[in-house]
């Protein structure tokens, strides 16, 4: 071993003593290859990138943020994907996207931490922006969303104007820049025809904390805890009863809420800016007077922030585009989370009993089967408090979405109803019915616009039942934010939420987790995202498509194809799934494509009994086979033999 090590050392000495040696030439070649690979990795991003310079808030110098021009980014993706190009062409046939009648752009932003959810580093948190278009059929698919900007949260917060300034610059570039959607439009060429597609901002989607940082709003803990209704005050403010026209977050009557108009919002921003100038520039008012202005208007002054950028005013209507996210309102330590815990506590349901119930052989939709079988972990020991009690429901949004219908069934069938328990049960059921309605609208089973009034009624009824049972002690700003959902439904006729944003985070995550160097971090992250997007576009399919490889159904039906799974209305249906068709149910036997249309070959069940308001019993193996159009099928939440 000594002789081998010595020989190796002598060889290395000869290499470094003789720079012209073959070995060193190989090292140079390796370095050259690394540079080539690095250039290739960044090539797509560099072709659409630009640099924005930001001043730091508390230190000298400037930060150069490398960003993708949104319009050029769309053009790049269209050039790399014929399938995406066809989607745009199909959308153009329905909506021309002219300057007078533009498309509607949806912009979402959120922060996330790369790494395991139980082992993450907050210093590596990144702020991501994504956009798509309302007119695209694939707007709920990740391939139809574009990521123009990623920035480390710590870096964004250290800039003058913070995240709000970053958002303002992005909006200006997106709509009013040299390639802006409102000024120039997207040039699209398809089958020899050339079009310019214009777009305006229709939806700005984030959670409450995102709007706090992105707009300069003082947030849910402020005197004005609702950015969409300016007559709503914090709970126990002692002002609502003394100020006519004002209510608190405990208000259950939507008719008493005043929806903030664009003029009113801009006036508030102007008042805040004027007060800030009078104090810091002219010293004409006291610090206490300034604080009172900020409290009463519910806004902070943010230099360069989106609410105080005069370039955007009258040209990019971001305020009326604000879209409250129902996922965070209900599922992220939200309204449904609280309601489920209150019902569990009231019924004295033990964690071990709930675990056993959730571990029964439930059949979930195929794509959710793995997660569904793990729902019992919500009540496992490591999610309980030190005494082994469920002091709160510790569950992710997707877990809670799968849990709530099973909890409702548990309380319906396993808990003895008593007069004392009735108010708790009524409140929980009313909350579940609100979520049921939102999910039906999200899946396209009902029209959000036509159902907006129903949503208002269900929200008001739930809040009244909750207050009748618990008082106002458990109410939080998210309860009053529910009222904002119906206003947006009437405007959009579409349900936008954070689930698509969470899915888009998965495109950033692989590059972010591998990142070791902090040099030009944003360039590296966006290069990885864009490369991944281009790769995924190569397998992009239609809004209804097979997931697996289809085969001929029969030699007698050569033009009929079948497969084991397909995507329909953003749902993944698999053979063996229990499906609904209006009031009927059945088992999916095959996914079928015939004559250019998709169907499900379904063995229909026979209705046996209605066990509860939300659970029915059916007789299976009837031999009654039907061919059902794909768009008429829906999934059950869970089934049991």
Residue ranges and their predicted role:
Residues 115-118, 139-141, 234-238, 330, ...:
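Short helix/loop capping segments that flank catalytic or ligand/cofactor-binding pockets
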Residues 106-108, 113, 130-132, 227, ...:
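Beta-strand cores of modular interaction/reader domains in eukaryotic scaffold and signaling proteins
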Residues 5, 9-107, 111, 176-409, ...:
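Charged (Asp/Glu and Lys/Arg) segments that form or flank catalytic channels of large polymer-
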Residues 2, 28, 35, 55, ...:
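Terminal interaction-prone segments of large eukaryotic proteins
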Residues 101-105, 125-129, 222, 497, ...:
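Core residues of folded domains in eukaryotic genome-function proteins
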Residues 122-186, 239-287, 291, 594-641:
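E2/UBC-UEV (E2-variant) core
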Residues 107, 124, 167-168, 219, ...:
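Active-site-proximal structural scaffolding
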Residues 78-99, 103, 112-162, 516, ...:
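Catalytic-core region of right-hand nucleic acid polymerases
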